[in-house]
């Protein structure tokens, strides 16, 4: 019940923020029409070319805004996902900790050619939506986290990982980057970030519903369409994924845990100015469970309420 309540609270908050951003971006229009307007602004040259073009700018923002240190010269490639790995729109393939000289590749899946032309076009995200995906997968999401974890002195944290940490961190960076200046206050960029947040919110609620409350796949798909504003293709993919991956609630769960830890750790250490130091220390442990990192970072002297999720 506590897990579900935390997820519902964050879903409601993100919906409210989306309504506010849409009122600025498309005054007088419905939220649905606002989202359609954002989605219609497709990346120039297609989704792969668009994602590739976003990488230098995102890396520079990480550097200029002191988001986190970049501990190595590696960069991620961007390519179309192979046919056997198109069950999700995007993912990054990162070499294991014992590999050397192998590149990381950010893969993007094209729409299913068997879908209608309308559904294929709707599947391709808008520029702002894709920007949040690129943040998640590369800078400063999974790829930057990999650069740190492969250099950690913590062998256990380097060789073993947790779903909540890896996906929680990558999802956390989407909102954090916008809060830190990505988009310079452009409501379209905020809407793109919120669409990704709502997608993860509905994953969270679907995981609980499908596996503990008798929710059907059709009901999950409807929730993705109505609460996360997903097109048919993405909604059907996401609902189906929930049947075999109940752990996909860890995107939102991990993000909420990191937000709580960041707020607790930076209080008295400079607040927003300490985000870079927080991120470097957080990433220095490898990929262990977030509650263990919380113990290490806050120490025995921390006199907070003991909660690991925001109130």
Predicted regions: what is each one?
Residues 1-32:
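Structured, charged N-terminal subsegments at the starts of enzyme catalytic cores
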Residues 9-16, 34-311:
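Long, His/Glu/Asp-enriched segments that create or flank divalent metal/ion-associated functional microenvironments
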């Amino acid at each position: 019940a506590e897990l579900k309540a935390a997820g519902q609270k964050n879903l409601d908050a993100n919906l409210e923020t989306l309504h506010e951003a849409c009122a600025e971006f498309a005054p007088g229009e419905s939220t649905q029409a606002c989202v359609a307007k954002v989605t219609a602004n497709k990346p120039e040259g297609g989704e792969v070319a668009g994602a590739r073009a976003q990488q230098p700018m995102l890396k520079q923002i990480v550097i200029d805004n002191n988001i986190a240190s970049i501990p190595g010269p590696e960069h991620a490639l961007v390519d179309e996902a192979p046919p056997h790995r198109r069950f999700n729109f995007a993912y990054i393939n990162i070499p294991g900790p014992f590999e050397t000289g192998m590149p990381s590749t950010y893969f993007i899946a094209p729409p299913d050619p068997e879908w209608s032309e309308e559904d294929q076009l709707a599947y391709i995200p808008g520029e702002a939506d894709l920007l949040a995906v690129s943040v998640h997968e590369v800078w400063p999401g999974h790829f930057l986290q990999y650069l740190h974890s492969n250099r950690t002195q913590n062998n256990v944290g380097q060789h073993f990982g947790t779903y909540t940490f890896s996906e929680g961190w990558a999802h956390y960076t989407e909102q954090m980057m916008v809060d830190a200046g990505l988009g310079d206050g452009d409501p379209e960029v905020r809407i793109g970030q919120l669409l990704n947040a709502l997608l993860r919110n509905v994953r969270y609620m679907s995981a609980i519903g499908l596996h503990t409350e008798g929710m059907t796949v059709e009901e999950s798909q409807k929730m993705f369409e109505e609460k996360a504003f997903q097109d048919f293709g993405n909604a059907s993919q996401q609902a189906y994924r929930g049947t075999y991956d109940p752990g996909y609630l860890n995107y939102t769960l991990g993000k909420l845990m990191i937000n709580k830890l960041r707020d607790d750790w930076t209080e008295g250490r400079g607040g927003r100015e300490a985000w870079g130091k927080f991120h470097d220390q957080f990433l220095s442990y490898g990929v262990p469970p977030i509650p263990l990192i919380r113990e290490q970072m806050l120490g025995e002297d921390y006199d907070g309420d003991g909660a690991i999720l925001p109130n």
